Amino acid sequence: MLERIKNSILNFPGRNAFYIEGKFYTYTEFAKIISRIRYYLQSNTSKEENLIGITARHKNEIENYAAIYGSLFSGKGYIPINPANPLDRNSKIIEQTGIKTILTGTIDENVIELARYNNIKVVEIPGLPDADINLDVPEVDENEIAYILFTSGSTGVPKGVPITRKNLNSFIDAFYSFGYEINEHDRFLQMFELTFDFSVACYTIPLCVGACAYTLPADGIKFANVYTTLEEHEITFACMVPSVLSYLKPYFDEIKLDKVKYSLFCGEILYEDITSAWSECVPNSKIINAYGPTEATVFCLTYEWNKAKAQNKSFNGGVAIGKPMQGMDAVIIGEDNRILARGQKGELCLTGNQLTNGYWRDPAKNTESFFSIQEGGREKTFYKTGDSAFVDEDGDFMFAGRLDNQIKIQGFRIELGEIEHFARQFTNSANVAAIAFQSKLGTMQIHLFVESPKAALQEMTEFLRKNLPEYMLPTGISFIPAFPLNSNGKIDRKGLLSSVQDKNGIS
């Protein structure tokens, strides 16, 4: 990957690498910032300090992207941290990883508070001295960490997913094996926060071919900004979450994006009816449904939906997730980790070059989530995704829902148990229930139910806001004197949700 980016900088020095907040940055300008960061890290940090924090704000800054590659080119891994997330959550990430330095484009109150609370050094990138451009690719073991992303944890402690350089390079190689027709003239959409793994594809892939990544403006409605960016900048490669389509659907009759060559979706279920409607908006675009958890480096299965096909594959209305990418494999298991035959529904498990070696310093979680199978005299390690699926006779995989209490909203993975964890902390009540549902617009939302005779909506909302990122906050909270129970004595979650649906007309 670094060799590809180095070649892009050398071959296309005057072409644009990024468009951020109304400004273009050329590959040469980007390389200069990378080199300043690289020089600083190599001069001011020890080899033992192999993980560097970078800020990942809602508002994009060129320095944040340069910090990623400044870290990688200096032989270190990076950890994106959003300073706007709760201080306690960010502090747990810093405590787990032991990072001592955080790179940022702008120092604000959140960054200052984070640094003081955790006694770490903050480096403001614009203040770094100039340095000669240095694009030498470091000699680093491929099993060294490229980045660690932290996902929601059911105990209230974020869990780290380390991705190695081998994992990342394998993903890039697998992506290019598809033979997509992309080059330095293409324009990529980058709509994601840097703490979300899908962003890795949106900024790395264009940099590898000398193309330009277009980020969204911080102001305004995010999904509306997606459409504006697609249209005004004639985006050719659009990576999106399906929620974007749900938002734009009322305007499909007015949308015609002839320049889009590829529409790639990941992070949520892509429904066939809205995919078909979207295909009329992008008449020249291939539509790809991609699947993959953070543990398998961005995505690792793909299916191309094509309106010219006699019949596209789907299950319960959701487009197939397709076949494993180059270097990856997938199986369906039942009880006792037994591999099931085609057509049988079970848990989707993944193995291959993109798979993480395990959670960051969490052996108990690793034992729970990974298992090994002897195959051809070799031991293969598989990751249990927690997703229900089956594989058809053609080898295409179909997603059939979650096996546990985990969902995705706008691509962000959310453990409903984490929301319940903090709700219990506030109420001292054992009975709380965070329930996900689909709104009339087709977007996933969360309603929190609390068994309590006393309603304290404002206080609870403030408490949750202090402990959870914005995307995890419930869209509604209901206080109920006594929860309904089913015949097994368990909380009747369907009954709870029905009460809200009947009251508010939720679909």
Label each residue range with its predicted role:
Residues I133-F150, V157, I182-F188, L194:
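Conserved pre-ATP/AMP-binding loop-to-beta segment of ANL
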Residues K159-R187, D197-T236:
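Conserved AMP-binding/adenylation subdomain of ANL enzymes
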Residues G14-N44, K59, S91, I163-N169:
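Conserved AMP-binding/adenylate-forming core of the ANL superfamily
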Residues K23, Y40-A84, R187-E193:
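Conserved AMP-binding/adenylate-forming
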Residues V209-A211, C239, K249-N316, A320:
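Gly/Ser/Thr-rich phosphate-binding loop
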Residues E3-T26, Y69, I102-R116, K121-P138, A146-I148, L168, K286-N289, G395-D396, ...:
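AMP-dependent adenylate-forming
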Residues T26-T28, E144-D173:
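Conserved AMP-binding A3 loop
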